[in-house]
């Protein structure tokens, strides 16, 4: 499988601040790869380096086998980029801004295929292209960048919090467009802190913390790293006593709940069957639980800061 993005030991320092501290990331061709972490973890810095907008301090970074700093012009012809906070020209209409962005990637407003795609996307995203940029809300500015990105085919889509400011219906349209470009063979790097979005869209996920990738793999692979929740009808936690591999046994809301290492679930089922439990549910860990495995301590610290609201 061809690797589209590769970084190894990537570092970026701003003075004494280490924004990236040995980041290793691999994104293969045709994947939708989730890049997950809170603000300040290093996601946007990584993306700026991959786009040739920032120069790395150390380590290696390549896109399509080329250096993103030295070969930025050639690479930008193959890349569509959507930031999380879009600025538009105040005196250009939305349609003019879209056409200008598309021209930078080789499209022309006289190209019938491009104009048809632009109009389809404007309708799908419920976007009014005749208004001036200064009249657009944050969500509509986001639509300008999304339409410009999706209207011209790209080999790689780098999307940094792309649904910021969109309402739920427009988020659905965004997911449809990701499915479309994926089916066409494009590669997508999706940076987000919206766990449900990443879980629905991505083939693989990399979790970043303090400038390093701390977990990377498919959701199935990552789920093996944490426990699965098992529950059944009952009011007494003693009903689960003695089950091999059971952890965190509690009874609440008429159900007995416990957790078990994900690779031990199959071995536990005969034990549960022997106890004639009813209403059995087995829930694999969600992406949120995987995420909290690495960031739970930070959230506890924030909740304990001052009045509990965090800063």
Segments the model singles out, each with a brief description of its role:
Residues 38-42:
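Walker A (P-loop) phosphate-binding loop of ABC-type ATPase nucleotide-binding domains
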Residues 59-70, 74-75:
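Conserved ABC transporter NBD signature motif
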Residues 115-137:
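Conserved ABC nucleotide-binding domain
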Residues 157-161, 166:
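Catalytic Walker B motif of ABC-type/P-loop ATPase nucleotide-binding domains
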Residues 174-259:
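ABC transporter nucleotide-binding domain
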Residues 227-298:
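Short, charged/small-residue-rich alpha-helical element at the C-terminal edge
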């Amino acid at each position: 499988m061809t690797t589209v993005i590769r970084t190894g030991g990537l570092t970026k320092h701003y003075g004494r601040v280490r924004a990236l501290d040995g980041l290793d990331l691999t994104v293969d061709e045709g994947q939708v790869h989730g890049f997950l972490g809170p603000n300040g973890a290093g996601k946007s810095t990584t993306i700026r380096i991959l786009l040739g907008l920032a120069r790395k301090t150390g380590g290696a970074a390549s896109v399509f086998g080329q250096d993103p700093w030295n070969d930025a012009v050639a690479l930008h012809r193959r890349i569509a980029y959507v930031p999380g906070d879009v600025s538009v020209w105040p005196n250009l209409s939305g349609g003019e801004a879209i056409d200008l962005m598309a021209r930078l990637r080789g499209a022309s407003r006289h190209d019938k295929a491009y104009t048809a795609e632009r109009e389809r996307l404007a309708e799908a995203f419920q976007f009014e292209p005749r208004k001036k940029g200064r009249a657009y809300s944050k969500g509509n500015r986001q639509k300008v960048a999304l339409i410009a990105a999706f209207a011209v085919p790209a080999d790689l889509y780098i999307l940094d919090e792309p649904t910021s400011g969109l309402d739920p219906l427009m988020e659905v349209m965004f997911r449809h467009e990701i499915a479309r470009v994926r089916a066409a063979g494009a590669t997508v790097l999706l940076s987000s802190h919206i766990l449900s979005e990443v879980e629905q869209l991505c083939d693989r996920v990399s979790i970043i913390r303090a400038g390093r990738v701390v977990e990377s793999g498919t959701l199935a692979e990552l789920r093996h790293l944490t426990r699965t929740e098992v529950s059944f009808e009952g009011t007494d936690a003693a009903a689960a006593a003695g089950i091999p591999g059971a952890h965190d046994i509690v009874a609440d809301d008429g159900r007995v709940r416990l957790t078990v290492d994900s690779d031990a679930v199959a071995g536990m089922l005969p034990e549960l069957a022997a106890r004639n439990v009813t209403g059995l549910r087995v829930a694999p860990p969600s992406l949120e639980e995987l995420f909290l495995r690495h960031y739970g301590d930070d959230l506890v610290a924030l909740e304990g800061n001052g009045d509990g609201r965090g800063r």
